[in-house]
Amino acid sequence: MELRVGNRYRLGRKIGSGSFGDIYLGTDIAASEEVAIKLECVKTKHPQLHIESKIYKMMQGGVGIPTIKWCGAEGDYNVMVMELLGPSLEDLFNFCSRKFSLKTVLLLADQMISRIEYIHSKNFIHRDVKPDNFLMGLGKKGNLVYIIDFGLAKKYRDARTHQHIPYRENKNLTGTARYASINTHLGIEQSRRDDLESLGYVLMYFNLGSLPWQGLKAATKRQKYERISEKKMSTPIEVLCKGYPSEFATYLNFCRSLRFDDKPDYSYLRQLFRNLFHRQGFSYDYVFDWNMLKFGASRAAEDAERERREREERLRHTRNPAVRGLPSTASGRLRGTQEVTPSTPLTPTSHTANTSPRPVSGMERERKVSMRLHRGAPVNVSSSDLTSRQDTSRMSTSQIPSRVTSSGLPSTVHR
């Protein structure tokens, strides 16, 4: 039986789940386009979807903010229908073998700072800045970075008076410990500075492949958070950023120097990385590592196919000397008559056994991935492309998914 939401959206297969809500692929019947549909049971202990949808609506119109298409209740569920997005930066990081080039990190940093600035301009702090919560767009918006998951967002100032929330201590850790600011670990109320410090750790994660406080073992979650906090505080910024341009250390030092209610100088931080970008001689062509990887895979597949054909041609001439110099039609007829032979087991002396090339399934898969991945430069990567290279069964869950990736509310989110 066909399930519909809001009498306009057809509910498809489940593509993600989170701590409070499941995400489904859907179809806007009127517009014939795919959407993301997030469902939350109305009987859930702590309903969150309605609050999140209200924050999304306040953010509407901003660059890199997903569009809310419909919100309401349907049967036993609270529902939010949203624009469908592509894979998260965490998915793309895995796709690129867990290392981004400096160019890609700087291209991302520029947009990510702007997304955080926009949220702050709307009187909210995000409080869960991490790679899973930044997604690339689809189609013509394939180079645009989106920010998602406002499940932990909090208003930090009054919209009319701009009165800042008061300084508090003894707060529980909110967000993801890996990227949490030091003040968050210390139980201090979060403010704008903490979102930006978290982004600094995300950028170094992209540079390094992992952070020094990853993989720490502990008996309880609380003890693990304490170990992460200790390691983070005992790792000097200069040590964390060693081997990378000084701008990354400058960025983190700037964020840590901010007072609780300070307004960050977003333009200064953006310009810091833009100057580095230009000094490196990079071009703002928005060709990210995943685009280059696609091109490389496509070329490799084409080269392998060409080499295969050449080997077949050489083999054919070796087996049929008389074919040399004949027109292609004649050689085809000759080959056709000679190949009608009884099928007998090949022996080790048969050159056919050793030299007949067979298409490499992995390479062929890469070629197909590439054809889907890139219809011009640069474009987005779809989740089906990601899963052809690796297992991406993990879902982030706050918001909008791609065909396999969600944009989501934390379940893998609140670590």
UniProtKB/Swiss-Prot annotation:
Biological process according to GO: endocytosis; non-motile cilium assembly; positive regulation of canonical Wnt signaling pathway; positive regulation of proteasomal ubiquitin-dependent protein catabolic process; regulation of circadian rhythm; signal transduction; spindle assembly; Wnt signaling pathway
Name of the protein: Casein kinase I isoform delta
Lineage: Eukaryota, Metazoa, Chordata, Craniata, Vertebrata
Coiled-coil boundaries: none
Species: Xenopus laevis
Regulation acting on activity, per entry: Exhibits substrate-dependent heparin activation.
Modified how: Autophosphorylated on serine and threonine residues.
EC top class, as a word: transferase
CDD domains: STKc_CK1_delta_epsilon
Reactions accelerated catalytically: L-seryl-[protein] + ATP = O-phospho-L-seryl-[protein] + ADP + H(+); L-threonyl-[protein] + ATP = O-phospho-L-threonyl-[protein] + ADP + H(+); L-seryl-[tau protein] + ATP = O-phospho-L-seryl-[tau protein] + ADP + H(+); L-threonyl-[tau protein] + ATP = O-phospho-L-threonyl-[tau protein] + ADP + H(+)
Family in the record: Belongs to the protein kinase superfamily.
Residues noted as binding ATP in the record, renumbered to the chain: 15-23, 38
Assembly, per entry: Monomer. Interacts with per1 and per2. Component of the circadian core oscillator.
EC number: 2.7.11.1, 2.7.11.26
